[in-house]
A protein has these predicted regions:
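A polyanion-binding, active-site-adjacent surface
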Residues: 1-111
Length: 111
């Protein structure tokens, strides 16, 4: 079991500092970190390309202590795409001119 809150804390902290705020109208909750999303980037629904290129976040990600060979943690070097993250952040990018405009209304978190 991976806990990206432990090994991917640096990008998660950037995400929280930049985008978490009071007074949003909606909260979108994920129920587990995807293997090619939050497990790689520390960001909820963290599809690598969209986290890096649209949200403007990138930071070092460590390897978990008990890394599984079939689910390696590559951080922002991961070339696989998280489908749910691509859909969520892709929709946000289509609807909002900037990430800041999106996060004025909604926050995304993983339970």
């Amino acid at each position: 079991v991976y806990n990206p809150l432990d090994y991917a804390r640096a990008p998660l902290e950037l995400y929280l500092k930049r985008y978490a705020r009071r007074g949003v109208k909606g909260l979108l909750l994920g129920m587990n970190p995807g293997p090619y999303g939050m497990a790689q980037t520390g960001v909820p629904f963290g599809e690598v390309a969209l986290v890096r290129d649209w949200l403007g976040l990138e930071a070092p990600v460590a390897r978990p202590a008990n890394e599984h060979p079939k689910r390696p943690i590559e951080g922002f070097a991961c070339t696989r795409s998280e489908v749910s993250g691509a859909r969520l952040w892709g929709l946000a990018r289509e609807r909002c001119p900037t990430p800041g405009a999106f996060f004025e209304q909604v926050f995304v978190w993983n339970y």
